[in-house]
């Protein structure tokens, strides 16, 4: 049964909801003021797995959201669209001490059991870090997360 559905807000959440509802045959109208978009302001870093926030509900939401992008990209491509708005590029987490870097590494290993999209984790030497990011010359403690990604929210909204 086709329904007429109104969505308030055309950022990444509203656009994604509209995309999937339309994909399932519903008539969708998106209402959006177009100013003050969080989607446009966000850096688009997708790497929630190493957060030290104690809020388990937040972590679950963020982690499952990160995992969802793979399916969204697959669906967009199946529909003949361009999913280049999402790129798995890896992420580098900088820490002040080797101990803090090791702690983050251990958190990542544990969380990877339930979130394989984290990918490989590697504590970087200073030389590896400066090779990867030449503009960082004074940092010595870093953790590489292969599954870290970048989302261009504006491009995603336009594509959906």
Predicted segments — roles?
Residues 3-29:
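N-terminal Rossmann-like FAD-binding beta1-loop-alpha1 element of flavoenzymes
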Residues 22-42:
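Glycine-rich FAD pyrophosphate-binding loop
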Residues 137, 142-160:
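Helical element adjacent to the flavin cofactor pocket in flavoenzyme catalytic cores
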Residues 33-34, 49, 160:
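Short beta-to-alpha linker loops that shape the active-site pocket of alpha/beta-hydrolase fold enzymes
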Residues 9, 32, 95:
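Short beta-strand/turn micro-motifs composed of small residues
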Residues 20, 68-71, 159:
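Alpha-helical scaffold segments in soluble metabolic enzymes
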Residues 45-128, 132:
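Dinucleotide-binding Rossmann-like beta1-alpha1 core, especially the glycine-rich loop
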């Amino acid at each position: 049964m086709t329904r007429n559905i109104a969505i308030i807000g055309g950022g990444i959440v509203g656009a994604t909801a509209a995309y999937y509802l339309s994909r399932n045959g519903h008539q969708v109208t998106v209402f959006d003021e177009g100013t003050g978009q969080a989607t446009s302001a966000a850096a688009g870093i997708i790497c929630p797995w190493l957060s030290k926030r104690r809020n388990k509900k937040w972590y679950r939401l963020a982690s499952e959201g990160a995992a969802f992008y793979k399916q969204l990209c697959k669906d967009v491509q199946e529909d003949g669209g361009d999913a280049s708005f999402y790129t798995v590029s890896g992420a580098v987490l900088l820490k002040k001490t080797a101990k803090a870097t090791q702690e983050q590494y251990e958190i990542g290993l544990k969380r990877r059991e339930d979130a394989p999209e984290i990918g490989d984790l590697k504590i970087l030497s200073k030389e590896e870090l400066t090779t990867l990011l030449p503009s960082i010359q004074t940092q010595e403690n870093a953790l590489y997360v292969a599954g870290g990604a970048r989302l261009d929210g504006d491009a995603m909204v336009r594509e959906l």
